[in-house]
Amino acid sequence: MKLTCVLIIAMLFLIVCQLNTADDSTDKQEYRAVKLRDAMRNFKGSKRNCGEQGEGCATRPCCAGLSCVGSRPGGLCQYD
């Protein structure tokens, strides 16, 4: 009887630890992805001279294959 109780408690403890670890790893992975995305955006070598799709075209022209749609100050680069 005591052995059965100890085994049940041990299994519950292991299950809780496993679930807790799984939850922590997904949060860290999402955070890591956001951090990597921000680092890529801020990388000095990645400065573009043209706007990509969905970006504003008030301060710089749209990239090749895109045109400025909407009013010039508030327009967005869209595919032709």
Swiss-Prot record:
Residues making up the propeptide: 22-48
GO CC aspect terms: extracellular region
Primary location group: secreted
Domain remark from Swiss-Prot or TrEMBL: The presence of a 'disulfide through disulfide knot' structurally defines this protein as a knottin.
Protein's organism: Conus arenatus (Sand-dusted cone)
Tree of life domain: Eukaryota
Family assignment from sequence similarity: Belongs to the conotoxin O1 superfamily.
Subcellular location: Secreted
Signal peptide: 1-21
Organ and tissue specificity: Expressed by the venom duct.
Record protein name field: Conotoxin ArMKLT2-0321
Keyword vocabulary terms for this entry: Cleavage on pair of basic residues, Disulfide bond, Knottin, Neurotoxin, Secreted, Signal, Toxin
Cystines in this chain: C50-C63, C57-C68, C62-C77
Pfam (any one): Conotoxin
A GO term for molecular function: toxin activity
Keyword Signal: yes
Methyltransferase among keywords: no
